[in-house]
Amino acid sequence: MIKPKNILFAWFWLTCTLTHAQLTMPRATSTYWRDSVPEAMRQSYISYGAQYIGQPWATIPDSIFGEFRRNGNRTHYEQLCFQKRTQLAAVAMAEIIEGKGRFIPDLKAGLDNLLAEPWWGIPAHYGPAQPKQKDQTVDLFNAETAGLVAWIRYMLNEALGHDMQ
């Protein structure tokens, strides 16, 4: 019978015995992405990302953000927000898989656009106009966007260069 203490021991043992290299995701420069990912899957990622080359990056007007407060509509904001993040992830993944630099200009433009947003959350999660100092919650969508940016920086750090740090 598996007991909680056995699970904790196994987790502790594994984390102590695995090397850093075994826990590290291969970066975009690794041959893993071109050698280990099946060709059909690679082509799918590349063609999905290619549809966004040269496409504009959505800017979300304050009026759309404010719709939730005015009339309860959150879908207009969410459509623009999710589309932008989908576009960014698609371009990033295409560059990781292809590795030729073709997606880098669009990726930089998308990161600039995303980093210029005043808030990464969803209007329905914004809370009162004057948040309480003791209320230190982390919004799920803020964290998800931060994770996306961190993942892109980790994977494509060299390709993005110093101007994106």
Locations of the language-model features?
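Bacterial Sec-dependent N-terminal signal peptides
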Residues: 1-22
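Short secondary-structure junctions and interdomain/linker hinges
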Residues: 15, 52-60, 98, 117-121
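Low-complexity, Ser/Thr/Pro/Gly-enriched N-terminal "stalk/linker" regions
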Residues: 23-69
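Short, N-terminal intrinsically disordered low-complexity segments that are rich in Pro/Gly
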Residues: 35-38, 77-81
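Short glycine/proline-rich turn/loop motifs
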Residues: 67-73, 129
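Aromatic-lined, polymer-binding surfaces characteristic
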Residues: 78-165
